[in-house]
């Protein structure tokens, strides 16, 4: 009986070590999201399923300012949707492999869904020593639409 218990404990220790190794080596990745290379002060667009982002990147020292508006993709929204119940917009700065180097989430107050008006987003991100490598910008969002 003690031999079986010892094997079970060894198995649990190895399983725990495996989980810790996987968790320690994993970082946030945005490879699955559309992205654009970082361009200073040029107006750019990223189209996603329900929102289209128009944005501009403004570097200030080691910080990166991003001013954006997220417009609803009208033909993708359900006809009954008339209100943003919850809105969280995210900005990600990633390296050439899609690894996130800096990010910021912004929660907006609920509001009527105006199909022609954009949702405002303005963030500042500290890039530290990463400023001098090829960088990309991506966006994410969480929307809860109501009627």
Model-derived features: where do they sit?
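Bacterial Sec signal peptide processing site at the extreme N-terminus
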Residues: 23-41
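Sec-dependent bacterial lipoprotein signal peptides
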Residues: 1-25
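Short, solvent-exposed, Trp/other aromatic-anchored flexible loops in extracytoplasmic proteins
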Residues: 99-135, 144-147
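Conserved aromatic beta-strand anchor motif in extracellular beta-sandwich/beta-rich domains
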Residues: 91-95
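Short coil-to-beta strand junction motifs in C2/discoidin
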Residues: 80-89
């Amino acid at each position: 009986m003690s031999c079986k218990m010892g094997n079970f404990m060894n198995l649990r220790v190895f399983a725990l070590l495996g989980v810790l190794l996987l968790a320690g080596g994993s970082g946030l990745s945005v490879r699955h999201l559309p992205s654009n290379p970082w361009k200073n002060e040029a107006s750019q667009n990223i189209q996603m399923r329900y929102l289209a982002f128009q944005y501009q990147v403004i570097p200030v020292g080691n910080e990166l300012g991003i001013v954006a508006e997220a417009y609803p993709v009208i033909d993708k929204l359900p006809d009954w949707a008339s209100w943003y119940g919850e809105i969280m917009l995210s900005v990600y700065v990633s390296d050439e492999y899609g690894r996130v180097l800096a990010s910021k989430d912004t929660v907006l107050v609920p509001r009527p869904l105006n199909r022609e008006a954009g949702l405002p987003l303005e963030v500042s991100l500290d890039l530290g020593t990463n400023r001098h490598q090829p960088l990309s910008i991506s966006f994410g969002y969480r929307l809860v639409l109501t009627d």
